[in-house]
Amino acid sequence: MLKMNLGDTELIVATCRKYNLTAFETAYVLATAYHETAHTMKPIMELGGTTYLKGKKYWPYVGRGYVQLTWKENYIKAGKKLGVDFVDNPGLLMEAKYAAPILVLGMKEG
């Protein structure tokens, strides 16, 4: 059972409300974040370590945040939605204030 005090659950729910998601959509967002963050409900970086990640074709745009956003194109798209340069500052995706709307808007709008 997901606890509301686990990690950033309350922030994610508040972000879902801000963008008018239904209860069913919010449940889906929470379940996705729970799975993608290894049950922490905190932004995480793709597992594997730097040496492993540098071998990925999408380096340095590796999975970050609540949904493990990857690839430069997706960093650009998320940046345009939020008005933030994630391409030059990929580490910002580890901040909840950016990771939450990326999670919610990405699932709502694609």
Annotate each PLM feature.
Residues T15-K18:
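Extended, non-catalytic subsegments within catalytic or DNA/protein-binding/adaptor domains
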Residues M1-L11, A23-E109:
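Peptidoglycan-targeting cell-wall enzymes and recognition modules
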